[in-house]
């Protein structure tokens, strides 16, 4: 054979086309959740959130138990006298009270008898005046001796009305007689037969005017009559002093947020008071409501995309990855629904306003914490038990006083009671002539308070009264004692954890070094998925540096490197509060660092010793008003003010509804008798009054003339015994019986409640006094002991799974992976088609010619089947970290992270030195006129004035209204039972009774 000569190497073939992408490998198992990272430092507070919508009104809470009585409230200013009310309807007659036992006998001593004056001729009777308001029932005086009854005279003829005689001069006042011992009641005399009515006499001639008689000496004090029925309640007096504040009731559940009241007009600034002594350190207040969440920073800048790697062949299925680090603690879920509001507690009595406390010091700002890198979300944990209740929040500042509400509509009338049985009506006698006004007896012993009377019928609703003038603000009271520390409240339920959001593209491998921040570049194409990076070790938390003085807020600069931790320094004195600086620009959010494992909770250190007071600082600006302090101690009662001049009578106000019947107070001491004033001039006739409400039933008129004698009828059948008649009208008191006055007995039982009487006319309004000067600000109280820190409650249970979170930002493009090993050559392809024959060449020389040039390559054959996947190449060493890419555009804000735990309360700062006294403010506008002062004690009786000349006869006034019925006399003898009357028509059906017991 011939020697085979190797020909020259042919040109390299064209590069093969890349094979199809391999199918994705099976998904790896999710690793167990890693341990929670350490809690980052507390970030700065976020901006205040907007007010949420008003919640629904809570159900009324249960009435709170009445607490111990609070300290005595300061004496309130006397209220403004109300407008005179219209005369109310006549109340029902009260039941007669039980007769009290006679009191002990006083010393019997006769006073000198005055000289009797000449008896003047009686003048003509004037028109009956309208009945005044009944005053409080006076103490019953001892009964005096009653003169013997004269023989009954025959009814004379009605004389003509004589002219009014001149007024007699008042006699000199005799010495007051000694109170005599009450005599025993005499036996009741037998009722005499009723006399025939006399015939009407002829009208008598007009009598001449009599000469003025000399006023007689005052007689002995009359016998003490029986206690009259309780008179109608007088007009409501001025508002009394505020009572002692009641103990605060148990705090009910928080009700629904009410609508904000209208903002009051800001008053003029008051003068700056002296800085008070440093107040006691208050107990640590309860944990306040969490502030609104701060804005979450945008995602970090996106790096440059890596170069596109060459798609290698499909690798074998990957091994199960190692469990990833524990995800951070899930964010708290939504707050639980508020519980139903409890019934409102009993309203406590109004206490005196406390003085505002001293302004607190502003602590130095803490170092800003760095945000930890959020880990993958862990599975939702089991729901924990409810924590203990947290401390109640601090008392907020007093809000603006709301407007006075409009007067409510009167309630519906009560159910009609069962109809009572009607007794026989007793005959009402004609009213007797008015006797001379007796002197007021000495004060008797105070009787036991009677039962409350039955409520009178509701009067027509009165018109709304005019708003009263605002009173003068009172002086600031002394600061109250520091309140007790409240209990720590239960922590709220843990919110529901939301499901983890869809996983973003896998991130970079090993973390690179932070380079200088460049300008934002255009986003590149997404790179291929790189290998997972190793989690770095968490760094140690540096100690907080010394807080410097608070300066003006500057523009936010770039974030610098963390400094070396310094030692804890001594807390400096709080400097003066500077003026607010301009708001700085918001800085870019830094890169999120890796989260380290949670460290053990350190033990709480012991409180440090109290430092020495520092040098005095300059006076700070006036702080906001402090919270309402505890009511101060009751001050000593002030001296009674002088009685002001009587003001003009106010216009008559509308009739108000009858108020509740108050207990009858003890009668006051007898005042000295005043001197008689000169007779007044005849007044002008008054204007026609408004038509008042229907008056009470008038008294029975005098008996009419006797009618003709009727024929004697036949004796009818005896009727059935009728119902017991009502007690008859009280007859006139009988003459006193013989015997000595007995000693007074013990107080009798309390009488039955009286009925409400008509509302009396209010007195004239006094002159409004000038507002007093505003008192200086009181010193704050001494600091109290600091309370013990509360114990941390158990962690709450994990909430239910929440809705899926938003899609996270795309991860950074990883570096290109290494090219895989070259695959094994594929199978040989089928031979290609034969080429077309070439042009016929020249005939060659005889013999073997030189080897011809290689022919052109044939057309590529069809693609052969895909070769088998080669073995997965080993991971090569990590290349050096490339330079940091420029910062990408800021992404959308991510979801809010969980709120950090509240740090421990810092140590108490040193006590500040008393600042300089501020300058007095401008004098405010004059306050509204104050309420009239209380009526002073009655002055001593002055000497009797000289006798004045007789006044001229006045013009007769208009006919007055029917007078009110007189007091009920002592009970008369019981009348005989009358014959049974005809059966009346059936009454209306009564209201249905209450349901019986089950």
Swiss-Prot record:
Keyword Glycoprotein among record annotations: yes
GO process terms (BP): extracellular matrix organization
Positions where 4-hydroxyproline occurs in the chain: 18, 21, 24, 33, 48, 63, 69, 78, 84, 116, 122, 143, 152, 155, 182, 185, 197, 203, 212, 218, 221, 236, 245, 248, 260, 269, 284, 290, 299, 305, 323, 332, 338, 344, 353, 356, 365, 374, 380, 392, 401, 410, 413, 431, 449, 455, 461, 467, 473, 479, 491, 500, 511, 523, 526, 532, 538, 547, 565, 580, 607, 613, 616, 625, 631, 649, 658, 667, 679, 685, 694, 703, 706, 727, 736, 744, 753, 771, 780, 783, 789, 804, 810, 816, 825, 831, 851, 854, 857, 929, 932, 950, 965, 971, 986, 989, 992, 995, 998
GO cellular component, one term: extracellular matrix
Residues recorded with modification 3-hydroxyproline: 693, 970, 985, 988, 991
Biased composition (Basic and acidic residues): 51-65, 899-913
Residues modified as Phosphoserine: 93, 595
Compositionally biased residues, Gly residues: 294-303
Glycan attachment residues as annotated in the record: 87, 914
Compositional bias (Low complexity): 26-39, 101-115, 122-140, 188-238, 347-401, 443-470, 513-535, 592-606, 619-646, 675-691, 720-729, 741-762, 815-830, 884-898, 932-965
Main localization, broad class: secreted
Keyword Phosphoprotein set for record: yes
Keywords: Extinct organism protein, Extracellular matrix, Glycoprotein, Hydroxylation, Phosphoprotein, Secreted
Domain of life: Eukaryota
Subcellular localization, as worded in the UniProt entry: Secreted; Secreted, Extracellular space; Secreted, Extracellular space, Extracellular matrix
Composition bias type Pro residues, residue spans: 142-154, 648-660, 803-813, 848-863, 983-998
Maturation and modification: Contains mostly 4-hydroxyproline. Proline residues at the third position of the tripeptide repeating unit (G-X-Y) are hydroxylated in some or all of the chains.
Tissue expr: Expressed in bones.
Residues modified to 5-hydroxylysine: 87, 239, 314, 559, 670, 840, 902, 914
Oligomeric form and interacting partners: Trimers of one alpha 2(I) and two alpha 1(I) chains.
Additional remarks: These protein fragments were extracted from an ancient femur bone collected in Buenos Aires, Argentina.
PANTHER family: COLLAGEN ALPHA (PTHR24023), COLLAGEN ALPHA-1(XXII) CHAIN-LIKE (PTHR24023:SF966)
Family assignment from sequence similarity: Belongs to the fibrillar collagen family.
The name this protein goes by in its record: Collagen alpha-1(I) chain
Record organism: Glyptodon sp. (strain SLP-2019)
Taxonomy of the source species: Eukaryota, Metazoa, Chordata, Craniata, Vertebrata
């Amino acid at each position: 054979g011939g020697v085979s000569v190797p020909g020259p190497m042919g040109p390299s073939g064209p590069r093969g086309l890349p094979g199809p992408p391999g199918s994705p490998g099976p998904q790896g198992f999710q690793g167990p959740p890693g341990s929670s990272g350490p809690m980052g430092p507390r970030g700065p507070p976020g901006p205040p959130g907007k007010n949420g919508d008003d919640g629904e009104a809570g159900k009324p809470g249960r009435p709170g138990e009445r607490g111990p009585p609070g300290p005595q409230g300061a004496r309130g200013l006397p209220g403004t006298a109300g407008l005179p009310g219209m005369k109310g309807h006549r109340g029902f007659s009260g039941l007669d009270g039980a007769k009290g036992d006679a009191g002990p006998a006083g010393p019997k001593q006769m006073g000198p008898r005055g000289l009797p004056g000449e008896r003047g001729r009686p003048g003509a009777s004037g028109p009956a005046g309208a009945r005044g308001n009944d005053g409080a029932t006076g103490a019953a005086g001892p009964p005096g001796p009653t003169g013997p009854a004269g023989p009954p005279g025959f009814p004379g003829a009605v004389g003509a009305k004589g002219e009014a005689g001149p007024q007699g001069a008042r006699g000199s006042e005799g010495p007051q007689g000694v109170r005599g011992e009450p005599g025993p009641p005499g036996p009741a005399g037998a009722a005499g037969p009723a006399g025939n009515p006399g015939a009407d006499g002829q009208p008598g001639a007009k009598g001449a005017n009599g000469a003025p008689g000399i006023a007689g000496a005052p007689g002995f004090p009359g016998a003490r009559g029986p206690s009259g029925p309780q008179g109608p309640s007088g007009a409501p007096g001025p508002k009394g002093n505020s009572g002692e504040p009641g103990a605060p009731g148990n705090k009910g559940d928080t009700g629904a947020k009410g609508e904000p009241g209208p903002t009051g007009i800001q008053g003029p600034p008051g003068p700056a008071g002296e800085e008070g002594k440093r107040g006691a350190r208050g107990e640590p207040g309860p944990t306040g409501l969490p502030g609104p969440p701060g804005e979450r920073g945008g995602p970090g800048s996106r790096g440059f995309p890596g170069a596109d790697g060459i798609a290698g062949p499909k690798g074998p299925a990957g091994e199960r990855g190692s469990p990833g680090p524990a995800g951070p603690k899930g964010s708290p879920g939504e707050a639980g629904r508020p519980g139903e509001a409890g019934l409102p507690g009993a309203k406590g009595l109004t206490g005196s306003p406390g003085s505002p406390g001293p302004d607190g010091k502003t602590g130095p700002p803490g170092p800003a914490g760095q945000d930890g890198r959020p880990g993958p979300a862990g599975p939702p944990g089991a729901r924990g038990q409810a924590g203990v209740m947290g401390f109640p929040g601090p008392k907020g500042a007093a809000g603006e006083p709301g407007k006075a509400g409009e007067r409510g509509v009167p309630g519906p009338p009560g159910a009609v009671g069962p109809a009572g049985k009607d007794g026989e009506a007793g005959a009402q006698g004609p009213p007797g002539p008015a006797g001379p006004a007796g002197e007021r007896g000495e004060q008797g012993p105070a009787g036991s308070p009677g039962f409350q009377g039955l409520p009178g019928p509701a009067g027509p609703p009165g018109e709304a009264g005019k708003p009263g003038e605002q009173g003068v603000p009172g002086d600031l009271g002394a600061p109250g004692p520091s309140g007790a520390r409240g209990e720590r409240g239960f922590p709220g339920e843990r919110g529901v954890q939301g499901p983890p959001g869809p996983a973003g593209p896998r991130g970079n491998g090993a973390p690179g070094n932070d380079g200088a921040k460049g300008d934002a570049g255009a986003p590149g194409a997404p790179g291929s998925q790189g290998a997972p990076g190793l989690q770095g070790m968490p760094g140690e938390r540096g100690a907080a540096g010394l807080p410097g003085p608070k300066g003006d807020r500057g523009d936010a600069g770039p974030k610098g490197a963390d400094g070396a931790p310094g030692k804890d320094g001594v807390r400096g004195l709080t400097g003066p509060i500077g003026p607010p600086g301009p708001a700085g620009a918001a800085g870019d959010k830094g890169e999120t660092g890796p989260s380290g494992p949670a460290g053990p909770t350190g033990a709480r250190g012991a409180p440090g010793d109290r430092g020495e007071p520092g040098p005095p600082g300059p006076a700070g600006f006036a702080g906001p008003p402090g919270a309402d302090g505890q009511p101060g101690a009751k001050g000593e009662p002030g001296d009674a003010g002088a009685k002001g001049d009587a003001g003009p009578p106010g216009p008559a106000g509308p009739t108000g509804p009858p108020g509740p019947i108050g207990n009858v107070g003890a009668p006051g001491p007898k005042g000295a008798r005043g001197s008689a004033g000169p007779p007044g001039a005849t007044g002008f006739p008054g204007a026609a009054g408004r038509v008042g409400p229907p008056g009470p039933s008038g008294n029975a008129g005098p008996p009419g003339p006797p009618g003709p004698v009727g024929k004697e009828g036949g004796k009818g059948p005896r009727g059935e015994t009728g119902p017991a008649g009502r007690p008859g009208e009280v007859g006139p008191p009988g003459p006193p019986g013989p015997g000595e006055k007995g000693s007074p007995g013990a107080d009798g039982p309390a009488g039955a409640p009286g009925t409400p009487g008509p509302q009396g006319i209010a007195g004239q309004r006094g002159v409004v006094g000038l507002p007093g000067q505003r008192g200086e600000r009181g010193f704050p109280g001494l600091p109290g002991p600091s309370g013990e820190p509360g114990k941390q409650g158990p962690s709450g249970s994990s909430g239910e799974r929440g809705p899926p979170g938003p899609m996270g930002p795309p991860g950074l493009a990883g570096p290109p992976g290494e090219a895989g090993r070259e695959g094994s050559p594929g199978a040989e392809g089928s031979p290609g088609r034969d080429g077309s024959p070439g042009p016929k060449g020249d005939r060659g020389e005889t013999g073997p010619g030189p080897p011809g040039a290689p022919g052109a390559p044939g057309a590529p054959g069809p693609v052969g089947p895909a070769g088998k996947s080669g073995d997965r190449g080993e991971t090569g060493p990590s290349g050096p970290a490339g330079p940091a890419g420029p910062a990408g555009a800021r992404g959308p804000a991510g979801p809010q992270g969980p709120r950090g735990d509240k740090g421990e309360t810092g140590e108490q700062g040193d006590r500040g030195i008393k600042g300089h006294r501020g300058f007095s403010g401008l004098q405010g506008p004059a306050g509204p006129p104050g309420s009239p002062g209380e009526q002073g004690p009655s002055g001593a009786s002055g000497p009797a004035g000289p006798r004045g000349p007789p006044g001229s006869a006045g013009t007769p006034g208009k006919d007055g209204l029917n007078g009110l019925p007189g007091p009920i006399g002592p009970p008369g003898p019981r009348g005989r039972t009358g014959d049974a009357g005809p059966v009346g028509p059936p009454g209306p059906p009564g209201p249905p009774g209450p349901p019986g017991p089950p």
